[in-house]
Amino acid sequence: MALTDLPITIGICAYNEAQIIERSIRSVYSQKLDGIVIDEVIVVSSGSTDGTDDIVKNLMSEYPNLRLIRQEKREGKNSAINCYLDSKKTEIVVMLNADNAFGTDESLQKLVEPLRADDVGITGGHPVPTNDPKDKVGFAVCLMWAMHHELAMIHPKIGELIAFKDIGTRLRTDMQSDEDMLRMKIEEAGMKCVYVGDSIILNRGPETLDDFIKQRVRVNVGECVMKKNFDYDIPTWNKKYLLKAMFASRKVVGFHPFKMLWVARLEMKCRKQAQEIADRGGDMPVWEQVKSTKKL
């Protein structure tokens, strides 16, 4: 690609995100861009009933290229992603969760820039949780995301924030996997994935143990289904990578061996439960919202 203005579309999936959607949208428009132009920000609200739609509509007068697409009933994230993929006009799409916000004003630029290369098809940002690591569950959240970052530096692992070239892939609505499915198809087309560690996206992890387990089981079910149905290996299941990532994560969370062991055992429990669900043919294309993650 030539070094000219690169048009992109921001896609945001929302379900009852009134508590955080405005901050997420404003974080997009606060980005400093050079040679990258946001054609549209498309919010797909899937069956929201809490005022999310009204908040987006009110912001549309301030941001003329902000667009709302409403799905009357909640159809799942993959359905919402397909909806904005079928509605956008640009090749490059940035996928942002409605309950996240950019952590720096250069994060979007850094995320998209690698896509100028012909051999790069998808990039992933660096999720940073706002949970308090002094709290027991907060420590688990911070450790998991610190390990995610360290592992991604070894072998790219993307999630929460991605940018990609649309090659025509549309997601199965009977599955929950989105980023991994898009990545698999892009890699099959001969392009590679790049992890952008300085493209920061803020998120909020669960605050209760029950919510943490619920979320980890769901995420792991999606990864187990990807392995079962497509024999696609997720790097976070590589034990060698995990050990290296846990050791390196001390830079962020400190060295707390007993807490780390507790988190490791908890994750093993969640993975075992997820594997059992996947083995029975289960998946979670529409999942119960984790309320404690909506306090960014």
What is each residue range found by the language model?
Residues 37-47, 69-71:
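Short beta-strand/loop segment that forms part of the nucleotide-sugar
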